[in-house]
Structure formats: C-alpha cells, structure tokens
C-alpha cells in the first residue's frame, strides 16, 4: 500500500485533546522496549526521556514496564547501575531525586540477545507477555513500543524479528509501534531500500521515523508563530522577504567520532533531516487542520517544489586537522562544513534564496533561523546603513525569538540605530521546564500522533534534493576547502551569502536578556 494512502485520524493537538479521548488512547499495559539499550543514544537520550515522563506521571507504574535489549551479557542490576548516573547527578542529589530514580529503575528489565536471531526475541516476547499478564486488567489492551537506538544497518533484521516474534497479541486491542532513528539511509536509493524493507513488515501508521529537531520547543512553535499571528500573514512571501538562513553551528570537531562521521559527512548528518524539516515549517502553506497528515502533506509539497541544487551555490569545507584523527583516511573528501542555497519554485517563494548552513569546529555553537526582509522603499532615514529587519528564531542555546528593527537613537539628534524586540524563553518563562525533544516525541509515539515524525514520502523527497550533490562529493567532483578551527568557516561561504543577497549588520550582536 502506498504511503499517500494512509490518512490516519488523530487528535488535533495535545492541548485540545479531551480527557476522555486521552484515557481511551492510554488504556492497558504499555511495554517500552529500548533496543541497543547499552549504547550511548539509549543511555544519554532515550532512558532519561523516559525517566522525565515517569516523573511527570505520564508513565504510570501500574501500566508501564521498560525493557532494555542488547547483545551485552549483563544483569538487570548492571543495566540499572549504568543508567543511574545519566538520570541523577552523582553529587548533590536530593533524597526525592534518588527515590524517584530507584522507583523508575525498578520498572527496567534487561534481556540479552543478538539482533538477528529468533531465540533472543522469543525470550524478549516471553518477558513482555509475563509483564502484560501481571499488570493487565480483563478490560485492558496491550501496547508495545519498540525504540531502535541502533545503527540503520540492523533495522531490517530487527524489524523482521519484532514482526516474527514480538507483535501485540491482545484480543482486546492495542498496538505495536516501531521508532527508528536517523540516518535513514545514505542517499535516495538506500533510503528507499530501507523504507521498502521496513514497509513490508509494518504499515506506515506503525512506523515513527524520529528526527529530534521536530521535538524542539521553538521548532514546534513555528506553526503557531506563522499561522496564529496576523501581522506575519501578509509579509511571509517573496514580496517582502529577501532571504532566509537556517544555520547549525558547532564549536567542536568530531571528537573521537571521526571514523563514524567520515562515512556520512555534515550534509548527510544534519541537512536533509534536521535543517530541511525546519525549512518545511518556514515555507509550507497553512494546512487544512492540525491533523498530522494535513501538516505532512504540506511539507511534502514544499520539498517537491525545491529546484535542483546548482554547483555554484554550494560551498564545502573541511577543518584543518580533521584527518589527524587516526580513524579518518588521510585523503578524506568528507565535508565538515557546507553552505548551500535552496530555491523553492512556487508562487510564495519564487526568487527567495533559502541559505542552509551547517558546520563543525566553528567559532560558536548555535542553531537558528534568520528571515531577512527587503530594504525599506523610499527610506528617508537612510536606515540601510543600520541593517535590515530580521526575524530570528534561536533554537539553541538560550531559546529566544527576536526581531531586529530600526529605532531612533536616544538623544537630541534624529539618528537611527538598530535594536530588537525580543522574547527570551529563560526570562519570560521562569519556573517552567522546557521538555527535551525526546520526551515530547516518545510521548507523541505513545499517543499515536505522527505530526512530528517523518513520513515515507517526506523522506524520499528530501533525499531527491540532496542525492545528486552527495554523489558528486562521493566521486570527488566537488572538494571541500580547508578552514581554520574556531573560525566562521571558509571565506567562500560568506561570499556566497553576500551573492545570495544576505546583508550583514556591521557590529551588531544580540545579547540575551539576563534574568
């Protein structure tokens, strides 16, 4: 069955779902299985997210049990001890924190086994079934959530084992869902092959392709900002916007992950998933409703409107010292920096360059969206010298939204200066804990909300955009230029930004408000 045939009716949003509907969705036992339980992703992200949901009483202990599965031969207590330091500070933890962790870890059980053998998965199924029998009521159903914190190379075999041995067996309802992590392939062909292999085992509503950027607070805020504020509606188009930047910067290199990173590079690692998802939310048309399929339909339309990438609108870089890592080949052509211009061929965005930039070992760590507006026509204040209006969404660190605008310089003279209107989340929402991305996305999976997950046709359209460029890099037809660690990246990237029309404000630095 084709992906586009799935239009699952789900809730409009967490906030508008009725208590009755939510109760129906969460009836019965819930078994959460973390495959790859001894790996870094599981220890640093998956289990801490589950713990935070538990603390918020969103994983009731009388319904939920958590299973770790991996090849390592360790006991339940050994896994619990490994996880403990990731859940609570080693020093200074309060008695309440220690008690919460102890109670949570009692819900965690470990099963050891290979990823391609029925024996291990039948043992896992036996353990899950025993939990369901002990915790289920006569009226309840059983729900099974499998989180694959594993390399994509083992997805097909693991999914086959789940399908063969571990599916929900309750006659009273329930479900089986599978969460898979990026990267979803290396190019269009491998992504489609992976999608086909998983798609032969599970239907699209059972598959949750997780991209943690879609769980970030300000990424989720994009739809609200765009479609719930009237003053943006007439401005959000090529008549008023000159260019859009989507930026991901890290101030550290590969840090011991050189061998792994070299297989993918900065483009595969960041751009077709995280940054392209952000682009979709910036550029999409208003969906018919907040139902997941309506939102994802609009995102696919954006992706299918992106023109082929031009070689002269790409700058690749590799920081000096990258190949000093013994796990990286001396002649590696892998980029650690990339700036590319994407152009959307539709009525709203014709002529507006979307500048997508990602890099490692740069002079700062941040992720942000910068929407730069055109110059004021007939400007009587000569404010062009001060810089353009920009709407900036800071995704990390120090989540914030601010608008750069020109105002009168305080004093006796009529002179203009650039300032900002800003919303700093740390200042405005003191005392409110902003959930981590994985918390939101795991909860969405439990609730059956696929709004913030990648559909198969989205994945295909994303790879169609970048596969030709990636193949040219793989063949050595495009080569990265060297840049100094701790710099802005290659000078050629700044030249490309200027060519695309981005105007830098000289000397302007946004300073987050202090608490």
UniProtKB/Swiss-Prot annotation:
Where does this polypeptide localize? Cytoplasm, Cytosol
What residues make up the catalytic site?
274
**Where does the chain bind D-glucose 6-phosphate?**
182, 212-216, 250, 269, 360, 365, 396
InterPro entries in the cross-refs? G6P_DH (IPR001282), G6P_DH_AS (IPR019796), G6P_DH_C (IPR022675), G6P_DH_NAD-bd (IPR022674), NAD(P)-bd_dom_sf (IPR036291)
- Enumerate the catalysed reactions: D-glucose 6-phosphate + NADP(+) = 6-phospho-D-glucono-1,5-lactone + NADPH + H(+)
- GO BP: any one term: pentose-phosphate shunt, oxidative branch
Q: Principal place where this protein is found?
A: cytoplasm
Provide a Gene Ontology MF annotation, just one. Answer: NADP binding
Give the family this protein belongs to, as stated in its UniProt record: Belongs to the glucose-6-phosphate dehydrogenase family.
| Oligomeric form and interacting partners | Homodimer.
Family matches, as NCBIfam families: zwf (TIGR00871)
Function per UniProt: Catalyzes the rate-limiting step of the oxidative pentose-phosphate pathway, which represents a route for the dissimilation of carbohydrates besides glycolysis. The main function of this enzyme is to provide reducing power (NADPH) and pentose phosphates for fatty acid and nucleic acid synthesis.
Q: What is this protein identified as?
A: Glucose-6-phosphate 1-dehydrogenase, cytoplasmic isoform
**Which organism's genome codes for this protein?**
Medicago sativa
């Amino acid at each position: 069955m084709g992906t586009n045939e799935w239009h699952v009716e789900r809730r409009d949003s967490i906030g508008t779902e009725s208590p009755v509907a939510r109760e129906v969705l969460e009836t019965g036992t819930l078994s959460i299985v973390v495959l790859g339980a001894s790996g870094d992703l599981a220890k640093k992200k998956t289990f801490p997210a589950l713990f935070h949901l538990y603390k918020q009483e969103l994983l009731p202990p009388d319904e939920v049990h958590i299973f770790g599965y991996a090849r390592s031969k360790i006991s339940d207590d050994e896994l619990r001890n490994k996880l403990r330091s990731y859940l609570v500070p080693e020093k200074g933890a309060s008695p309440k924190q220690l008690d919460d962790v102890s109670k949570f870890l009692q819900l965690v059980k470990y099963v050891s086994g290979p990823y391609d053998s029925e024996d291990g998965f039948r043992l896992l199924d036996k353990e899950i079934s025993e939990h369901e029998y002990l915790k289920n009521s006569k009226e309840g159903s059983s729900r099974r959530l499998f989180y694959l914190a594993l390399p994509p190379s083992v997805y097909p075999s693991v999914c086959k084992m789940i399908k063969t041995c571990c599916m929900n067996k309750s006659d009273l309802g329930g479900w089986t869902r599978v969460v898979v992590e990026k990267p979803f392939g290396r190019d269009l062909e491998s992504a489609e092959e992976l999608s086909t292999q998983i798609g032969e085992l599970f239907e699209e509503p059972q598959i949750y392709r997780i991209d943690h950027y879609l769980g970030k607070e300000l990424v989720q805020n994009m739809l609200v900002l765009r479609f719930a504020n009237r003053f943006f509606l007439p401005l959000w188009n090529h008549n008023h916007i000159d260019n859009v930047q989507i930026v991901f910067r890290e101030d550290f290199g590969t840090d011991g992950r050189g061998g792994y990173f070299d297989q993918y590079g900065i483009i595969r690692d960041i751009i077709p998933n995280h940054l392209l998802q952000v682009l979709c939310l910036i550029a999409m048309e208003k969906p018919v409703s907040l139902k997941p399929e309506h939102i994802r339909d609009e995102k696919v339309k954006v992706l299918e409107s992106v023109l082929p990438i031009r070689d002269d609108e790409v700058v690749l870089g590799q920081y000096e010292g990258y190949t000093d890592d013994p796990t990286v080949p001396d002649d590696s052509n892998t980029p650690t920096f990339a700036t590319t211009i994407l152009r959307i061929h539709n009525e709203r965005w014709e002529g507006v360059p979307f500048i997508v930039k990602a890099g490692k070992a740069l002079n700062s760590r941040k992720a942000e969206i910068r929407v730069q507006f055109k110059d004021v026509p007939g400007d009587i204040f000569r404010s062009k010298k001060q810089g353009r209006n920009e709407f900036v969404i800071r995704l990390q660190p120090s989540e914030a939204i601010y608008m750069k605008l020109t105002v009168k310089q305080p004093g006796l003279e009529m002179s203009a200066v650039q300032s900002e209107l800003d919303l700093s989340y740390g200042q405005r929402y003191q005392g409110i804990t902003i959930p981590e991305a994985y918390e939101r996305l795991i909860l969405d999976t439990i609730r059956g909300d696929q709004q913030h997950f990648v559909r198969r046709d989205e994945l295909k359209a994303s790879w169609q955009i970048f596969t030709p460029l990636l193949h040219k890099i793989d063949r050595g037809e495009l080569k990265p230029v060297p840049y100094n660690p701790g710099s802005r990246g290659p000078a050629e990237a700044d030249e490309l930004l200027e060519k695309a029309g981005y105007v830098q404000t000289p000397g302007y630095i946004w300073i987050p408000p202090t608490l």
